[in-house]
């Protein structure tokens, strides 16, 4: 794992996201973050990573149970305080999660996440 490269890629990514709160690249099987973090001191990204890995794993299993050829892309979780967009990447082994403020532009977030996906996969 090229931790320095991952940090660089995610720092560039953060600069493009309006309403950024947190992002993480997380191993779905163990819930451990391999890069990322939060600008909000009240938001513990490591706890979120661990719990959302369970959600991402269930999402992948559900897609494949419905149709073995169905490939998961992303999922959206909303709360009164944030929007969480998670993209399943790297052969369903990792997810790239982004938390933003509720007034953020989701379409732009999705586009920017897709833009950085290959760089993130290379840095894993």
Model feature map: region roles:
Residues 1-124:
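Non-catalytic interaction/Regulatory regions outside core domains
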């Amino acid at each position: 794992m090229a931790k320095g490269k991952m940090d660089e890629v995610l720092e560039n990514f953060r600069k493009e996201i309006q309403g950024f709160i947190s992002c993480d690249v997380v191993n779905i099987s163990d819930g451990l973050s391999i890069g990322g973090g939060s600008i909000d001191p009240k938001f513990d990204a490591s706890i979120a990573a661990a719990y959302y890995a369970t959600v991402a794993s269930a999402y992948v299993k559900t897609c494949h149970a419905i149709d073995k050829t169905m490939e998961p892309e992303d999922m959206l979780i909303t709360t009164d305080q944030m929007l969480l967009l998670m993209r399943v990447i790297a052969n369903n082994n990792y997810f790239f999660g982004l938390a933003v403020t509720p007034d953020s532009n989701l379409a732009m977030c999705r586009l920017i996440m897709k833009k950085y996906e290959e760089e993130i996969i290379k840095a894993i």
